[in-house]
């Protein structure tokens, strides 16, 4: 049996996340204590609007994911392959030994600020389109771009693709998609046009930041968002720089894991969004998610099967 561990991205954040894990597991508490007092307050008892903000959601989710990965590691649960959705890629890289916790937190805070700055003054949104095939939506995207800017941000799973861009561009593509037979469209709880060309200023800022970052040896194979596979000759920093303004090939990443022999996947949440993507992409993979302390106990029993 080969095990994959995957980490959730922005949009999965929720007020109250990590409360019980913080109380029970010292290794989780150590990770969450790397957050500022204000970030911990927002995570535990803030408002939905506060935790949605990029500069809050990203470090909180990173600390949550790293904390859970340390709980699993202490219990001897180790991935054969790992990946994460957008922000979650940094959590995966940290769990694989590429970044220290402190380095990852510094990079993510920088990334969040750069992405928020790139979003300033833009009237942009993200939306999930359900029930359309990849090539059809790509052609509709080109048509919508005749009126306003919109890009494909995430290929989550067959039948669910996320679009991102100006409010006018996304609205136009939603209209075209529904006319073409999409089951429905759904606006997402994020605060910027992520994984589009609007993020090029953030990408350039990250390229400069990475010049001062120490990259450790990768102890677990990581599947990267912007290529949907392990790296070959590509540098990690180049893949992360490209990631912020490129499409995320999450469905291809899960297929890659399956082709490498992965039969079980643990999603580190909060939430179960990625588990849903896995089930729709590779039905033969068994998947379970972690959000609470009770979920940790469920995972231990699940792995014994």
Feature names for model-found ranges:
Residues 10-12, 37-40, 96-246:
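Alpha/beta catalytic cores of group-transfer enzymes, especially the acyltransferase/condensing modules
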Residues 1-136, 142, 188, 264-294:
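FabD-like malonyl-/acyl-CoA
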Residues 60-65, 243-250:
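A short, flexible low-complexity segment enriched in Lys/Arg and Gly/Pro that occurs
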Residues 296-302:
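Short, charged, surface-exposed secondary-structure boundary motifs
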């Amino acid at each position: 049996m080969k095990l994959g561990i995957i980490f959730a991205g922005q949009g999965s954040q929720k007020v109250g996340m990590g409360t019980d894990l913080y109380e029970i597991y010292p290794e989780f508490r150590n990770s969450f204590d790397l957050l500022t007092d204000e970030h911990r307050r927002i995570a535990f008892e803030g408002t939905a609007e506060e935790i949605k903000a990029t500069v809050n959601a990203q470090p909180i989710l990173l600390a949550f994911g790293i904390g859970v990965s340390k709980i699993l590691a202490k219990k001897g649960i180790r991935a054969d392959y790992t990946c994460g959705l957008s922000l979650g890629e940094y959590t995966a890289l940290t769990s694989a030994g590429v970044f220290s916790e402190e380095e990852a937190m510094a990079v993510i805070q920088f990334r969040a600020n750069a992405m928020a700055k790139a979003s300033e003054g833009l009237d942009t949104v993200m939306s999930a389109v359900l029930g359309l095939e990849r090539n059809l939506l790509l052609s509709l995207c080109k048509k919508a771009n005749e009126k306003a800017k919109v890009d494909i941000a995430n290929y989550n799973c067959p039948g669910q693709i996320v679009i991102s861009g100006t409010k006018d561009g996304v609205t136009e593509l939603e209209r075209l998609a529904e006319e073409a037979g999409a089951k429905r469209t759904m606006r997402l709880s994020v605060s910027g046009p992520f994984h589009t060309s609007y993020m090029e200023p953030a990408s350039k800022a990250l390229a400069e930041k990475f010049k001062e970052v120490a990259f450790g040896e990768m102890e677990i194979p990581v599947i990267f968002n912007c290529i949907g596979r392990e790296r070959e000759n590509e540098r990690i920093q180049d893949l992360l720089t490209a990631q912020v303004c490129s499409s995320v090939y999450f469905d291809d990443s899960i297929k890659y894991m399956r082709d490498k022999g992965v039969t079980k996947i643990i999603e580190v949440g909060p939430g179960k969004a990625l588990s849903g993507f896995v089930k729709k992409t590779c039905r033969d993979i068994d998947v379970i998610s972690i959000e609470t302390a009770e979920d940790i106990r469920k995972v231990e029993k699940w792995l014994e099967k």
